[in-house]
Amino acid sequence: MGVESVRCPLHFTKMQGAGNDFVVLDLRDGTPPPDAALVAWLADRHFGIGCDQVIAIEPPRGVGVFAAYRIWNADGSAAQQCGNGARCVAAWLVRDGSVATEHFLIDSPVQTHSVRCIGKDEYAVEMGLPVFEPERIPLSGFPNALGEYVLSLQGEVLCCGAVSMGNPHAVVEVDLIDVAPVERIGPLLQQHSAFPESVNVSFVQVIDPGLVRLRVYERGAGETLACGSGACAAAVVLMQRGRVGRDVRVVLPGGTLRVQWPVSGGPVTLSGPARCVFDGVWYG
């Protein structure tokens, strides 16, 4: 479904999870997914609808799964993982009447997610196992004894953690989140040769063992009000270092998420809000 061939009017739902906002399309009837140009047009906040990412809900791919979805960044590039998006897909299915149970499965591009409704407009999604092996993040290089990667950025030395939550993340711990160099360091890390597929960059400040503050510079979107996989990445990196406990509240500019990782060999769970903002029709 490209810009020239898109069927107008195009019905959509605007959704948000902790301020991370999405244009959601129902493509379960077999309508082709949007191409990169159409995604960028829809995501444009001046000439389109406006969002951080576009989500297409598609027929399920496996037994026992209620639906599958694909997700694209605002620049039209494909995304593999999105915790806030997964919760919004779950909320969309519940609102649509497609799901009548509190616990169900949905397919993302990289895995099947177990989702639970835990309250009004609140969902918990199982995000899978974090991956720390550098070649699987992917990341060239090896961590030091503290689990940090030491990188050179235009003459500066930067230490960061790294993990894949289905997509690559770098985690930079800072003293004061409000003055963190997000707009400067974020693009530099994304363009660094150590990250062959680029990277999402999380800047995190530890408040206490159960609370952190976070800002995320996302691939293909820039800084967003919230990033669910970024919250998981920051939390598990800090847990590995013993900086926080296994159940952490993550405060982002758009709201608060909860990350739980009870055991190192088990899956990470992300909890937080997912809400419908409005239904609309796009005329192109």
Swiss-Prot record:
Its EC number is 5.1.1.7. The record marks 169, 218 as: Could be important to modulate the pK values of the two catalytic cysteine residues. GO terms for molecular function: diaminopimelate epimerase activity. One of its GO terms (cellular component) is cytosol. SUPFAM superfamilies: Diaminopimelate epimerase-like. Pathway: Amino-acid biosynthesis; L-lysine biosynthesis via DAP pathway; DL-2,6-diaminopimelate from LL-2,6-diaminopimelate: step 1/1. It catalyses: (2S,6S)-2,6-diaminopimelate = meso-2,6-diaminopimelate. InterPro entries: DAP_epimerase_AS, DAP_epimerase_DapF. Belongs to the diaminopimelate epimerase family. This is Diaminopimelate epimerase. It comes from Xylella fastidiosa (strain Temecula1 / ATCC 700964). The lineage of its organism: Bacteria, Pseudomonadati, Pseudomonadota, Gammaproteobacteria, Lysobacterales. The gene is dapF.
